[in-house]
Design a protein with these regions (language model features):
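Conserved binding/recognition cores within well-folded domains
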Residues: 1-70, 74
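C-terminal structural segments of small proteins and small subunits
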Residues: 72, 76-77, 83-84
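Charged phosphate-binding loop/patch that engages nucleotide di/tri-phosphates or the phosphate backbone
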Residues: 84-93
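Intrinsically disordered, low-complexity N-terminal regions enriched in serine/proline/glycine
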Residues: 38, 80-81
Length: 93
């Protein structure tokens, strides 16, 4: 649960914690098969831990951002995955 999100950058996958990040030796699609159910894909390049989301902000342009408890980090949510994330959060209540 200490991992806030996974993200790809330069063909590498990184796991982000509250104040650091480290490289992971899996592809995102491989991670989706092995991480707990409360993680959710939010873009082609990111998977988020839904248990640590503090807020979701949606702008007029349609882009969205997730913020986390106890961290200044934020992550972009693509329009395509926004509803999937919202449904996942409702399901977990």
């Amino acid at each position: 649960e200490s991992i806030l999100f996974f993200e790809t950058s330069d063909n590498k996958v990184y796991a982000h914690t509250t104040d650091e990040f480290f490289e992971v030796k899996f592809k995102l699609y491989e991670l989706e098969q092995i991480i707990p159910f409360y993680y959710c894909r939010i873009s082609k390049s990111s998977i988020i831990n839904t248990k640590v989301i503090y807020s979701l902000e949606k702008s007029f342009s349609g882009s969205s951002t997730a913020s986390f408890y106890d961290s200044k980090k934020q992550v972009h949510i693509s329009r395509h995955y926004y509803k999937i994330l919202k449904d996942k959060l409702k399901e977990m209540r």
